[in-house]
Amino acid sequence: AHDENMGALKYFYDDAPAPIICTRFTKHVIETQFNFNTLRIPLEFKVIPPTSALEIAGRKFHFFQTSHNAAYSFGVAIETSKGNIVYTSDFIVDYSVKIPAYIFDMKALSVLSERPTFLLMSESKGANHEGYCSPHHRVTPLIEKYFSNANKRIFIDCFWQNFFRISEIIDLCIENNKKIFFYNDFT
């Protein structure tokens, strides 16, 4: 849940109100964004776990957690008579992630694969490269040397909704006995 992915919500929700199906984390991001922009539109949320199933308008929707730099992101598969229509935003499969908010639910995806897939809509950047991609969501290997070498302050600019990266920075601060001060337009 990044604000650039939901920017249109404030423009059309009044004209086409419907429940916003999301995780608790995404609900918080949406509410924060609307409060920051002083938009007082009453929103209806349907909060779900990242891996779950729901019936909407007579169709079965299956949600499965993916790994992304936004916590509890998910893809969705919609059952149809011809097979599943599957949508995922950008994600990676990182088997080393131990934080529950960022674990790819391979088991849920495996269960979905037991039915035919009629249409797959997924990011494909880098699909033409063999092997594995680098976990681009990790910043620790790139900046930890600055923490161990710094005698004074370190300033870091980071996207406020990238909680994976923020948690890495907090961990580095704790490991290197650095004080933390957060600043953004909300503080």
What does each model-found stretch correspond to?
Residues 2-185:
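His/Asp/Glu-rich metal-coordinating catalytic cores
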